[in-house]
Amino acid sequence: MKTFTAKPETVKRDWYVVDATGKTLGRLATELARRLRGKHKAEYTPHVDTGDYIIVLNADKVAVTGNKCTDKVYYHHTGHIGGIKQATFEEMIARRPERVIEIAVKGMLPKGPLGRAMFRKLKVYAGNEHNHAAQQPQVLDI
């Protein structure tokens, strides 16, 4: 018996919607990364994108444990000399709550073209509304 290898054109991708209200950031991100990668499927193949599309709602209501609300710091660089910028978790949630989940999930996906393709299937929204009703997403309880 030969080893099964999924073909990109035959992979069936479903759409799921997840409510992030009250969920712990890291635990939510690990499950999202696992499903984006396709590891929950029997036909998982490491070098093929077999994951599903995931819509995350209420990103502004995601929780962190301990003092991470004030202690967790996100850094980015503008590209100019002395251009390192930082923001705490509270500031990120106030400014762009979607980025908190996106950064957490992106760090858990493979680096390179395959990881970028997987990351494109993640849709994160701060509020309770999304514009993917045509895809008929199923509710996923994490």
UniProtKB/Swiss-Prot annotation:
InterPro entries per the UniProt record, alphabetical: Ribosomal_uL13, Ribosomal_uL13_bac-type, Ribosomal_uL13_CS, Ribosomal_uL13_sf
Annotated GO biological process: negative regulation of translation; translation
Job of this protein: This protein is one of the early assembly proteins of the 50S ribosomal subunit, although it is not seen to bind rRNA by itself. It is important during the early stages of 50S assembly.
Species classification: Bacteria, Pseudomonadati, Pseudomonadota, Gammaproteobacteria, Enterobacterales
Pfam families: Ribosomal_L13 (PF00572)
Any one GO CC term of the record: cytosolic large ribosomal subunit
SUPFAM superfamilies given in the database record: Ribosomal protein L13 (SSF52161)
Top-level taxon: Bacteria
Record's subunit section: Part of the 50S ribosomal subunit.
Family note: Belongs to the universal ribosomal protein uL13 family.
Keywords per UniProt: Ribonucleoprotein, Ribosomal protein
Classification via Gene3D superfamilies: Ribosomal protein L13 (3.90.1180.10)
Disulphide bond pairs: none
Recorded GO MF terms: mRNA binding; structural constituent of ribosome
Descriptive protein name: Large ribosomal subunit protein uL13
